[in-house]
């Protein structure tokens, strides 16, 4: 498979002020060659990105793994994605043979791996990747209006820094090489606070423990970002594309 080669670019946890506004699918297609690939997605959540990849790229097969057992049970009810196999395991213990995938993708999930298991997770990714295989790591950047709302009940600054440091260690270890680091913003449009609450507070993969008083603060901050067109946020992201050496 023809893949992009390494560019000499330093790693940064946050990007420049001016960034393109685009979708993750556009970035994926620009950075990866999916044709005929066997793909592993770690932390597939409700399988939104899983569906996009399965339906809009040329992959041959895909394993979509999720550690949240409640969400995994829901994913198993999906019947219209014949290329996809849903599985229940984490990045630190990938249930797959050695050198069995061309591409591994993590959408906003690396920072959810426990800090003590991050290095083990990269060792597992190295194990199951084919020689020359790629790891696409998309992480949210800890800044912006959307982040200002979320941090009130889910402050991820420390774990995101830990995930970023783990990427650096994986490169320094010689297992992986950095191909490219890219920054972009994606647009999140929400109709109401109720939609925000349902999608980000009332989740099954984490216990938010949001008190009534805190919920009022979250709502107030969310409402403060209302625009004429509604609740529209440009969310900053960082993608690190690695290749197995």
Listing of model-derived features with the role each one plays in the protein:
Residues 2-27:
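Class I SAM-dependent methyltransferase Rossmann-like catalytic core
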Residues 40, 45-94:
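Class I SAM-dependent methyltransferase SAM/SAH-binding core
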Residues 92-104:
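A short acidic, Gly/Pro-enriched loop at the edge of an enzyme's catalytic core
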Residues 102-117:
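A short SAM/SAH-binding and catalytic strip from SAM-dependent methyltransferases
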Residues 119-131:
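A short glycine-rich, Lys/Arg-flanked "PGG" loop and its adjoining helix->strand segment in the class I
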Residues 134-162:
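Conserved class I S-adenosyl-L-methionine
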Residues 174-245:
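Conserved Class I S-adenosyl-L-methionine
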